[in-house]
Amino acid sequence: MKNEVKFMSEVIKVVDVKIFPHRYLKAETTEKVLNEIYDLDGIVRVIVHGQPLPKTVPFGPARGLPVNHQDRKVIKVKGEEMELRVKVGEIIITVEGEKLEKIMDGIEEICKRNFPFGYDIYVGAFTKIKPTVTDYMKYGDISSIDPRLIGMVDASARLKDSVKMIK
């Protein structure tokens, strides 16, 4: 289940861990869980997925009107402020392969404390580890970018609007 990425003249061995809570997370819970995850040693990157929380109604008769959703908040993760734009339904953590067992113990404890409603944890490859065509189109010379950005590209969005680098 380990993936090797030859990038910038080094080999990075990484494994993805997916946390799938049985309910969507509130902004406060998301903030708490992300801070606890980033306290673990060996975390490469963390991705949150979920239903979008738009600022304005995207279509229909109310198109353009503001959406005042209670979970579209600014949260603080490791001292960095970020706007939560999704109702978090899953968290994908990319970890260093050699630290997987220790990290899994920590993740299990974090989940037990914060998800009394239940959760599932999966280990595998859930993210891109090799540069995609879109990466080449967006960045050009791939050898000069941070390896954590591989596969994180939305071709139609600005990087600062779609990716927040925490660590």
From Swiss-Prot:
Keywords, ordered alphabetically: Methanogenesis
Claim: Cytoplasm is one of the keywords in the record: no
GO biological process, one term: methanogenesis
Oligomeric and partner information: MCR is composed of three subunits: alpha, beta, and gamma. The function of protein D is not known.
Protein's name according to its UniProt entry: Methyl-coenzyme M reductase II operon protein D
Organism expressing this protein natively: Methanocaldococcus jannaschii (strain ATCC 43067 / DSM 2661 / JAL-1 / JCM 10045 / NBRC 100440) (Methanococcus jannaschii)
Gene of this entry: mrtD
